[in-house]
Amino acid sequence: MSQLGHRYLMESDEESVRLDLKTDTDAVEKQALWAGIEPGMRVADLGCGAGKTTFVLNQLVGPAGSAVGVDMSPQRLDYAESHYSHAGIEYVCKDIREPLNDLGMFDFVWLRFVLEYYRHESFDIVKNISKILKPGGILCLIDLDCNCLRHFGLSERLEKYLIEIMEIMENKFNFDPYAGIKLYAHLFDLDYQDIAVNLTPHNLIYGELKETDNYNWTKKVEMAAKTSGCRFQDYEDGYEGFFKEFLDFFSDHRRFTYTPLISCRGRKPVAD
């Protein structure tokens, strides 16, 4: 997802493909059903990226429902239109930090893997998108905790620099490695009702490395390391040495990696 006046940390010519490949449609369906999506609903997928999730949500609401995918990146939306167009789906280019009233009202609003890019504005974004949700409608927030930080089998040196990279991203680039742990508080502070929380592993990687995990993590670490400006002084060849050690670690079948995924859903209060 890219937003006006906000640097999207993963931006590259290959980002639409990365988002497409990493999206597990079975997981999206399971999460949406858990949150309470139903046939006939009008759904907003905010930060829709490549459109794959919007397509799944539209299938779940069926022909009596509809889905609007919203993203600020024209490149993502072009990809979505080319790969995930369908009757009942509309893609719109908008900044979710700005008023969204012209989109109309929705029964179900979905925000997945977006707040991690807005450490300082996350609550304001949730408050803003809540305005397009009908009273009694469902808001579903999904994000990661300890993002990119839970590994076993790596050297102390590699672990040190992975932590340093994420600290730089957090302090200088508004990235939030701990976005998931805050989701419940966002809904609680907006007086949402029937709040439910689910905790599952998002990445659970051990043994032989899947090609999709290899591609996704390679791109994530490459982009974060380069963007951070970290000097990697403990490596004779700097970034190249760091990146090679990460690739060697990640391809080792002994390696164990996971990322906690926190899903939170609630119903918007019905006015008296």
Where are these regions (language model features)?
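Core SAM-dependent methyltransferase catalytic element
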Residues: 190-191, 261-272
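Class I SAM-dependent methyltransferase SAM/SAH-binding core
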Residues: 44, 50-99, 124
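Conserved alpha-helix/loop element of class I SAM-dependent methyltransferases that forms part
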Residues: 22-41, 56
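A short acidic, Gly/Pro-enriched loop at the edge of an enzyme's catalytic core
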Residues: 100-109
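A short glycine-rich, Lys/Arg-flanked "PGG" loop and its adjoining helix->strand segment in the class I
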Residues: 123-138
